[in-house]
Each structure stands twice: as structure tokens, then as C-alpha cells.
Curated annotation (Swiss-Prot):
Function: Permease that mediates the proton-dependent threonine and serine uptake.
Source species of the chain: Salmonella typhimurium (strain LT2 / SGSC1412 / ATCC 700720)
Protein name, per record: Threonine/serine transporter ThrP
Catalysed reaction, written as an equation: L-threonine(in) + H(+)(in) = L-threonine(out) + H(+)(out); L-serine(in) + H(+)(in) = L-serine(out) + H(+)(out)
Keyword Lipoprotein among UniProt keywords: no
Protein localization: Cell inner membrane
Membrane-crossing segments per the record: 17-37, 40-60, 97-117, 123-143, 156-176, 201-221, 244-264, 278-298, 333-353, 360-380, 401-421, 430-450
Alphabetical list of Pfam families matching this protein: AA_permease
Length: 461
């Protein structure tokens, strides 16, 4: 009898999945990028987070509906392959892989900068290299151990945000750190009004805010390794998005209410200022540590996703079969190792280019358009998924809402965001980089005849 090959193991519990998704979504962008969006929109950035969150909610409910019936590793890439075509499955998997590689390299770069806060003479490539090693060890461990590591990584930044929101509410309503005098809501309407940046500033910020939600769909990547996936994923999809909304909107609300929006960024990080407001003198060091772990957590979640995407491509015969190799611990070791190798090469940019901020901006911005591809694919796949599962949908306990209008509205919204990115000088280049990448992988697909290898699955296979 042939020896059974190792397979991915269902070792992730609900708490692991929820924190993996939170860890991938709430990253350096919230801690370091809040000042940028406030610069453009003023207090109305709050509304931008709420609007973007509503459309992301529609995307997540669409994905949750499919995950309940088909909890497979690779989720939306597999659904694209199955319900659209092998090409779209291929394009989605590579787009998501590219997005997380770009995010991973940018966050590894950021880690080098954060460590220099304590050790200013240290070359930035040294902590970057150490971080790659730590991420590799975490991702090559058994999936349950990986889930535990990421759980505690993500818990650090989640706890920090919760504490900051509580402190901020105390300052706003009870005057903590302000001589007992409540600050109130004056800063939301003063200094130019709620829409201080005008509609142009609001729409510019909205384009950036949408990108900050990328990573929430990581829940889908965990589907093939979740314990009792129908129950676990249904719970995770519902909880994670609400928590992200509360953390993002709550943190930004506290910042723009306590401080005049036009002063944020000029006097340091708003997170540092909030903790310093109540007399925590070590605020800068605390926040630097939190942002360091946030970068590690985001990169860790990203490498998890990258390994599973390469595994899905190999299973669809769009990469060599060797890439689908799974260790005895149930880890897609070949896919993870290849992704870590690219991350290692990318981290060498820290040695070649002396300006870390330039590396961070260029690489991170390149991830925006490829990161949107899975969202479009989820919405389109679900339209066809419904037609293929008419009987199962009738008594489905986790159906998406406002179907199919929510799908069409969300796709229209995403198209508007892309148009807005084109007309914004700060984001136009990232759009071009994304287009070039998508054209390149399409060319590879056609030239190497990968369509001959990637046959579409039958429904229910």
C-alpha cells in the first residue's frame, strides 16, 4: 500500500484565525500612516474609514458565504479557478502573493528603522535580516504553533489600540491629563471644519484608507487549516471585521478629537502624543516597541499567506508539483521557503539603498492594485457560486446580504477608487506598478501555456 503523503492540518482555532486576520490588517499603516490621511482630509477621514469599512463588509460576507460550503486552502484563488477560469485563479494567487511580498519587504525595511530608535548606530539591514529569520522559523513550525505565535504578536498591538482608545475617551469626556477639563468635540469642527480638506482631500484619503483594509481576507487563506471550519470561519468573519472597524474608527476618532488635525504629524506620532498626554513619559519607547511587533506580525501573516498561495498554484498544476510539498507537520514547506527566499532578497534593499523611507514607500505602494484583485474576484466568483449552489443557498445560515446589488455596488466603488488613484499624483505610480505586474504575469501565463495545465474544477469537486 502506498504511503500517504502529508497534507495540511486543521490545527487553527477561532482565536488563531481572528488574530491572524487582525495581525495582517492592522499593521504599520495605522500607527505610522494616520497622519498622512489626516493631512489630506482632516476629521472627515473618520467618514472615509466608515464608508470603506461598509464595502469591505460586503466583500467579507460574500467570501464567508462561499467559505461555509467550500472551506479550502487558497479560498478566493480556488474559487476564481473554479467559478471563473483557471487564468483568474492563477492571476488572483499571484496578485495576492505579490501583495504580501511587497508588504513583507516594506515591513522588514520598517523594522530596521524602528530598531535604530534604540541603537542609532546599527546598520538597518542587520535587524531586517534577524526579522526574516524569525518569520521563517514561525512559518516553518507546525500550523498550530504558528497560530499561537501570531496570536500573541497581534495581541500586543490590539491591546495597545484598546488602551489608547480608553485613555483617549478619558481625556475627551473626563479631562484626564488636561487638568480635569474635558476636551469635548471642538476639534472635529474647528480648524477648517469637519471637511477641512474639501471633497478632493476626502476622496484622496478614501483611496488610501481602502488600501489599509487589505489583509482582512486572510481569513479565507486559513480555511483549509481551520478546526471545524463551518463554525470557526462563520464566527471569525463576523467578529474580525467589526473589531477592525472599531479599532480603526475608534483610534482615529480619539486622535482627531484630542488634537487639532492640522497639528498632527508635526509634533510626533499621534499615538505617542496620546499616551504622553496622561503623563506616560516612556510613550515613545512603548509605541516604538508596539510598531516593531506590528511590523513583525504583518510580515508573519503575509508569509503564511504567500506559502499557501504557492501551494494552491502547484495543486492546480500552474507551478511544479514540488512546490506543493507538505512537511510532516502539515506545513507547505516548499511554498513558504520560496517566499522567505524572495523576502530575504528583498531585504537586501536595506543594504543597497541607504534611505529606508524611500524603500518603504516604493515597495509598499506597489502592493495596492494587486491587493484589490482578490476583492473583485470574490465578488464575481460569488455571483457564479450562487448559480452553482441554488439548493444549498436556500437554507444557507450565513448568506451575504443585499445580493447581488451589494456585489455590483462594491465593484463600482472599487473602480472609483482606482480612478481616484490615477488622478492623485501620490498614488498614480503605485497604480502603474500594479498594472505592469498584472500584465507581466498574464504574459507568462500565455507564453508558457499554463492554461493547458490549469483545468477548471467541477463544482463540488
Amino acid at each position: 500500500m502506498a504511503e500517504k503523503k502529508p497534507e495540511l492540518q486543521r490545527g487553527l482555532e477561532a482565536r488563531h484565525i481572528e488574530l491572524i486576520a487582525l495581525g495582517g490588517t492592522i499593521g504599520v499603516g495605522l500607527f505610522m500612516g494616520a497622519a498622512s490621511t489626516l493631512k489630506w482630509a482632516g476629521p472627515s477621514v473618520l467618514l472615509a474609514y466608515i464608508i470603506a469599512g461598509l464595502f469591505v463588509f460586503f466583500i467579507m460576507r460574500s467570501m464567508g458565504e462561499m467559505l461555509f460550503l467550500e472551506p479550502v486552502t487558497g479560498s478566493f484563488a480556488v474559487y476564481a479557478h473554479r467559478y471563473m477560469s483557471p487564468f483568474f485563479g492563477y492571476l488572483t494567487a499571484w496578485s495576492y502573493w505579490f501583495m504580501w511580498m511587497a508588504v513583507g519587504i516594506s515591513e522588514i525595511t520598517a523594522i530596521g528603522v524602528y530598531v535604530q530608535f534604540w541603537f542609532p548606530e546599527m546598520a538597518q539591514w542587520i535587524p531586517a535580516l534577524i526579522a526574516v529569520g524569525l518569520v521563517a522559523l514561525a512559518n516553518l513550525a507546525a500550523v498550530r504553533l504558528y497560530g499561537e505565535i501570531e496570536f500573541w504578536f497581534a495581541m500586543i498591538k490590539v491591546t495597545t489600540i484598546i488602551v489608547m482608545i480608553i485613555i483617549g475617551l478619558g481625556v475627551i469626556f473626563f479631562g484626564f491629563g488636561n487638568g480635569g477639563q474635558a476636551i469635548g468635540f471642538g476639534n472635529l469642527t474647528e480648524h477648517g471644519g469637519f471637511f477641512a480638506g474639501g471633497w478632493k482631500g476626502f476622496l484622496t484619503a478614501l483611496c488610501i484608507v481602502v488600501a489599509s483594509y487589505q489583509g482582512v481576507e486572510l481569513i479565507g487563506i486559513t480555511a483549509g487549516e481551520a478546526k471545524n471550519p463551518q463554525v470557526t470561519l462563520r464566527s471569525a468573519v463576523g467578529k474580525v471585521l467589526w473589531r477592525i472597524l472599531i479599532f480603526y474608527v475608534g483610534a482615529i476618532f480619539v486622535i482627531v478629537t484630542i488634537f487639532p488635525w492640522n497639528e498632527i504629524g508635526s509634533n510626533g506620532s499621534p499615538f505617542v502624543l496620546t499616551f504622553a498626554k496622561i503623563g506616560i513619559t516612556a510613550a515613545a519607547g512603548i509605541i516604538n516597541f508596539v510598531v516593531l511587533t506590528a511590523a513583525l506580525s504583518g510580515c508573519n501573516s503575509g508569509m503564511y499567506s504567500c506559502g499557501r498561495m504557492l501551494y494552491a498554484l502547484a495543486k492546480n498544476r500552474q507551478l511544479p508539483a514540488a512546490v506543493a510539498k507538505v512537511s510532516r507537520h502539515g506545513v507547505p514547506v516548499a511554498g513558504v521557503a520560496l517566499s522567505i527566499l524572495i523576502l530575504l532578497v528583498g531585504s537586501c534593499l536595506n543594504y543597497i539603498i541607504p534611505n529606508p523611507q524611500r524603500v518603504f514607500v516604493y515597495v509598499y505602494s506597489a502592493s495596492v492594485l494587486p491587493g484589490m484583485v482578490p476583492w473583485f474576484v470574490i465578488l464575481i466568483s460569488q455571483l457564479r457560486f450562487r448559480r452553482a449552489h441554488k439548493e444549498a443557498i436556500a437554507d444557507h445560515p450565513f448568506r451575504s446580504i443585499m445580493f447581488p446589488w451589494a456585489n455590483y455596488l462594491t465593484m463600482a466603488f472599487l473602480v472609483c477608487v482606482l480612478i481616484g488613484m490615477y488622478f492623485n499624483e501620490d498614488t498614480r505610480m503605485s497604480l502603474f506598478v500594479g498594472v505592469i505586474f498584472l500584465l507581466a504575469v498574464t504574459l507568462v501565463y500565455k507564453v508558457f501555456g499554463l492554461n493547458r495545465h490549469g483545468t477548471a474544477h467541477k463544482v463540488g469537486e
